[in-house]
Amino acid sequence: MRPSERAPDVLRVVTLETGVNRYAEGSCLISFGHTKVLVTATVEENVPGWMRNKGAGWVTAEYGMLPRATHTRGRREAALGKQSGRTQEIQRLIGRSLRAVVDLKALGERQISLDCDVLQADGGTRTAAITGAWVALRIAVNYLLEEGVLKTDPIVGQVAAVSCGVFKDTPVLDLDYEEDSQAEADSNFVLTNVGDIVEIQATGEKRGFTRGEFEQLFALAEKGIGELFVKQLEAVSAAKPR
């Protein structure tokens, strides 16, 4: 039995609230159970120096945790003077995941930055950030299309992510912190709505895991992400015009 009493193939309660930042071109507050991540999308009419004069845009992401997002207070990375390796890894993952479903040439020479701030962490912050970031990005691009800034939609699909793991020898979907801290193996899956794999991170924590267990984890991820795609579209559809 899982601590949350969920069945192995059941997500936590997932909500996506849009329009939570009045200034950003797109915003989304996503919750996976007690994990809460605020994502804002900012459109800038320029690109990084290495992208100039290439006729294409860029999508990037930053990720951070509020000091009391976890059980004990952590110092702000700005106060420490540098980002941790974990932070850099996660924000690169978010950026890669979003660019997998964006035609950068259709975006034109502009950049969209997704800022992902973890308000509360209870496992799965990176997967929540990816899933919520797509919603914020979609809303921002819709705004550019409505304003006539873009003539062609640069977003070519959906992307979402979820964690899976082996908990007490049972493959389960969407681990919370209690499960993740005790799991024999854990993984993160990033998939598109046409079934393409963007990234899979899988690690044996307390033991190795079998090919059969991996395939069960993959099947759970496909099921969970399929449900997330529906929730993403519902959130975008319900978003009020800026």
From Swiss-Prot:
<dbReference type="InterPro" id="IPR020568">
    <property type="entry name" value="Ribosomal_Su5_D2-typ_SF"/>
</dbReference>
<feature type="binding site">
    <location>
        <begin position="124"/>
        <end position="126"/>
    </location>
    <ligand>
        <name>phosphate</name>
    </ligand>
</feature>
<dbReference type="GO" id="GO:0006364">
    <property type="term" value="P:rRNA processing"/>
</dbReference>
<comment type="similarity">
    <text>Belongs to the RNase PH family.</text>
</comment>
<dbReference type="Pfam" id="PF01138">
    <property type="entry name" value="RNase_PH"/>
</dbReference>
<keyword id="KW-0694">RNA-binding</keyword>
<comment type="subunit">
    <text>Homohexameric ring arranged as a trimer of dimers.</text>
</comment>
<dbReference type="GO" id="GO:0009022">
    <property type="term" value="F:tRNA nucleotidyltransferase activity"/>
</dbReference>
<dbReference type="InterPro" id="IPR018336">
    <property type="entry name" value="RNase_PH_CS"/>
</dbReference>
<dbReference type="InterPro" id="IPR036345">
    <property type="entry name" value="ExoRNase_PH_dom2_sf"/>
</dbReference>
<dbReference type="InterPro" id="IPR002381">
    <property type="entry name" value="RNase_PH_bac-type"/>
</dbReference>
<dbReference type="GO" id="GO:0008033">
    <property type="term" value="P:tRNA processing"/>
</dbReference>
<dbReference type="InterPro" id="IPR015847">
    <property type="entry name" value="ExoRNase_PH_dom2"/>
</dbReference>
<keyword id="KW-0548">Nucleotidyltransferase</keyword>
<dbReference type="GO" id="GO:0016075">
    <property type="term" value="P:rRNA catabolic process"/>
</dbReference>
<dbReference type="Pfam" id="PF03725">
    <property type="entry name" value="RNase_PH_C"/>
</dbReference>
<dbReference type="InterPro" id="IPR027408">
    <property type="entry name" value="PNPase/RNase_PH_dom_sf"/>
</dbReference>
<dbReference type="GO" id="GO:0000049">
    <property type="term" value="F:tRNA binding"/>
</dbReference>
<protein>
    <recommendedName>
        <fullName>Ribonuclease PH</fullName>
        <ecNumber>2.7.7.56</ecNumber>
    </recommendedName>
</protein>
<comment type="function">
    <text>Phosphorolytic 3'-5' exoribonuclease that plays an important role in tRNA 3'-end maturation. Removes nucleotide residues following the 3'-CCA terminus of tRNAs; can also add nucleotides to the ends of RNA molecules by using nucleoside diphosphates as substrates, but this may not be physiologically important. Probably plays a role in initiation of 16S rRNA degradation (leading to ribosome degradation) during starvation.</text>
</comment>
<keyword id="KW-0820">tRNA-binding</keyword>
<keyword id="KW-0698">rRNA processing</keyword>
<keyword id="KW-0808">Transferase</keyword>
<dbReference type="InterPro" id="IPR050080">
    <property type="entry name" value="RNase_PH"/>
</dbReference>
<keyword id="KW-0819">tRNA processing</keyword>
<feature type="binding site">
    <location>
        <position position="86"/>
    </location>
    <ligand>
        <name>phosphate</name>
    </ligand>
</feature>
<dbReference type="GO" id="GO:0000175">
    <property type="term" value="F:3'-5'-RNA exonuclease activity"/>
</dbReference>
<dbReference type="InterPro" id="IPR001247">
    <property type="entry name" value="ExoRNase_PH_dom1"/>
</dbReference>
